Amino acid sequence: MSVLNNSEVKLFLLIGIPGLEHAHIWFSIPICLMYLLAIMGNCTILFIIKTEPSLHEPMYYFLAMLAVSDMGLSLSSLPTMLRVFLFNAMGISPNACFAQEFFIHGFTVMESSVLLIMSLDRFLAIHNPLRYSSILTSNRVAKMGLILAIRSILLVIPFPFTLRRLKYCQKNLLSHSYCLHQDTMKLACSDNKTNVIYGFFIALCTMLDLALIVLSYVLILKTILSIASLAERLKALNTCVSHICAVLTFYVPIITLAAMHHFAKHKSPLVVILIADMFLLVPPLMNPIVYCVKTRQIWEKILGKLLNVCGR
């Protein structure tokens, strides 16, 4: 009896970088380094926020949520990417593939949700600073975190089940070194219309998050322009720089990939694979760096911890 009902395919094949399979071991070095830095950076953010009472504020709680989603993205894709690039082990069972998709898409939706509530945080801090603390209480922040986690799970939990009901006859070659819903459903030899529609719905949810983020920044910009002092304008705008960088590093690869899939007639498979890998590697790596550099309270606390360790 096969892994999937009436299916012939027992194994999906992942792909590294086409034509450069002989150099996979060399590509694995920067990939491993990026994963290591991403995990260390996000763990550092979480540790500093947890251990420093002065950082127990809404802005930093949301940053901790972003670090959790970044670590989730990294750890979800890490096993298969390392297997492909380190050991040229391309095979993955359908059930393992579906499980990986659940976590990758789940943490993607979670990151999108976190970026949205972080934009709300910036809007409240700039537009209504006097009521900021009374509106975003610790209890409300915890409830928001719980809601976005539940939202992420509920949105992606149908993915594994809708994929399991499909039949996979002959095609088994995936397009990346990890599993994605839109990639796997194309291998099916049965009707995948439900998967196409639901995948489009999830994409719309993510784009709705982006639209609301853009709207929040329109309102933020309107508020900033109403401030009389130029120095105060720049100070208010500077508090948004880290979040804007996080939004760009997360959404630009997604939008670029979607545009290439829909509009580029002669797209290069190599370019598509590199951009897809950037989507999972760059945000978890860059977010801790950007927030540590741009947020004085964080790098001061990190520096203080390092000096305490060195002084012992």
UniProtKB/Swiss-Prot annotation:
**Keyword Glycoprotein attributed:** yes
So which residues have sugars stuck on them? 5, 192
Record topological domains on the Extracellular side: 1-25, 76-99, 161-196, 258-272
- Main localization of the protein described in the UniProt heading: membrane
Q: Which keywords does UniProt give here?
A: Cell membrane, Disulfide bond, G-protein coupled receptor, Glycoprotein, Membrane, Olfaction, Receptor, Sensory transduction, Transducer, Transmembrane, Transmembrane helix
Note the SS bond partners. Answer: 97-189
List the Cytoplasmic topological domains.
47-54, 121-139, 217-236, 294-312
Localization: Cell membrane
- Kindly indicate where the leader peptide sits in this chain: none
The membrane-topology field of this record reads: Multi-pass membrane protein
Query: What residue ranges are annotated as transmembrane?
Result: 26-46, 55-75, 100-120, 140-160, 197-216, 237-257, 273-293
According to the UniProt record, one GO cellular component term is: plasma membrane
**Pfam families, per this entry?**
7tm_4
Q: Does the keyword Glycoprotein apply?
A: yes
State one molecular function term (GO): olfactory receptor activity
Per the record, the similarity remark reads: Belongs to the G-protein coupled receptor 1 family.
What is its biological role? Odorant receptor.
Q: What is this protein called?
A: Olfactory receptor 51A7
> What is the species of this protein?
Homo sapiens
Name the gene that codes for it.
OR51A7
